[in-house]
Regions:
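Catalytic helix-loop patch of NAD(P)-dependent Rossmann-fold dehydrogenases
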Residues: 105, 140-182
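C-terminal substrate-binding subdomain of Rossmann-fold SDR/epimerase-dehydratase oxidoreductases
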Residues: 224-306
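Conserved Rossmann-fold NAD(P)-dependent oxidoreductase catalytic core, especially the SDR/UDP-sugar
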Residues: 113-160
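N-terminal Rossmann NAD(P)H-binding glycine-rich loop of SDR-like oxidoreductase domains
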Residues: 2-3, 7-29
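NAD(P)H-binding glycine-rich loop region in Rossmannoid oxidoreductase-like domains
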Residues: 42, 55-106
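A conserved pocket-lining segment of Rossmann-fold NAD(P)-dependent short-chain dehydrogenase/reductase
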Residues: 153-158, 187-221
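Glycine/proline-rich active-site loop of Rossmann-fold NAD(P)-dependent oxidoreductases
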Residues: 180-184, 195-208, 232-243
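Conserved beta-loop-beta element that borders a ligand/cofactor-binding pocket
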Residues: 130, 171-196
Length: 306
């Protein structure tokens, strides 16, 4: 497959669960990447340079966005330039890693700092990681019901936990800066990220105990397919501020979607005809607008009937 000319991308949080798969996918598609993180990239064979950066410190972020991607940058006369795109995944990944106030302030501050620095340095493409948790149920208090199915980007959302609220605040910062600076900022509401080995280790319990997957709306995103999504976002210009659900196509269940939801969420309205196996956290927009086509359907890796 031939890919378009690669871009220079600064990626924050690339050493985390998602980034360690997304960055190699970006490299395969011809991009060059600088990783901003507090720990090195876990795969030395990629030759990805990690610049240790505290994203909650505005000065460090501004400086990191005007840094050579590797030592080869010193070999020509061109001083460090801002990147073509910034992909911001760096954050506390969920609640209960640190106290709630720290999770909120760090995530919001980091997102603000990255967006502000990128916009003021003239970067025209910014992609930020939001979360499925904004749909309220994942870390909501008690056994909550979803508002309706499918879950899509136009729904009014009102999460109650610090992590999800921090992600919603990040979306609002992105919307405002996209308008002020006339740039593209795409916010990805990322589903439950699945690494390749987790199909064998985790999917047996996911399928046999459906109630445990309610918090994820019985949906997921393969970490490698998330890399494809990031590439599509980098390549597609001119959309301004956008929110995209970043999920794979199908429900993680033995039974077709409508039958499954009627059993597990009988009181939740279904607002349109859904595909036979369509994931409740809908990726229809990202397929229609960006052309996403999943490569890693979960049934390739785990047969629920065996």
């Amino acid at each position: 497959m031939a890919f378009p000319t690669g871009k220079r991308i600064v990626f924050t949080g690339g050493s985390g669960k998602a980034g360690r798969y997304v960055i190699p996918e970006l490299l395969k598609r011809g991009h060059s990447v600088l990783n901003l993180d507090l720990v090195p990239f876990p795969d030395p064979s990629t030759n990805i340079m990690t610049l240790k950066t505290d994203l909650t410190k505005s000065g460090e972020v501004f400086n990191a966005l005007t840094t050579h991607f590797n030592f080869a940058g010193y070999e020509n006369a061109l001083v460090p330039q801002p990147p073509d795109a910034v992909i911001h995944f760096g954050a506390y990944a969920r609640n209960m890693l640190v106290p709630d106030n720290e999770c909120f302030q760090a995530n919001v501050t980091a997102t603000y700092n990255v967006i502000e620095a990128a916009c003021k340095l003239g970067v025209k493409k910014i992609i930020i990681a939001s979360s499925e948790t904004v749909y309220e149920v994942c870390f909501g208090q008690g056994d909550l019901e979803y508002t309706s199915f499918p879950l899509d980007e136009d729904m009014d959302v009102n999460p109650m936990d610090s992590y999800a609220i921090s992600k919603l605040c990040g979306e609002r910062v992105a919307r405002g800066f996209a308008r002020r600076f006339d740039v593209d900022i795409y916010s990805l509401r990322i589903g439950n990220v699945i690494e390749p080995h987790e199909y064998a280790t985790d999917f047996p319990s996911y399928i046999s105990n459906p109630k445990t997957r309610k918090r994820n709306a019985w949906s997921y995103i393969d970490a490698r397919d998330l890399g494809q999504i990031c590439d599509l976002c980098v390549q597609r210009d001119g959309l301004g501020f956008q929110i995209f659900n970043a999920t794979n196509d199908t429900i993680t269940a033995r039974f077709p979607t409508r039958q499954f939801l009627e059993h597990w969420c009988p009181d939740t309205p279904v607002t349109r005809q859904m595909g036979m196996w369509e994931a409740p956290l809908s990726n229809a927009k990202i397929k229609d607008v960006l052309g996403f086509r999943e490569e890693h359907d979960w049934r390739k890796y785990y047969n629920p009937d065996q």
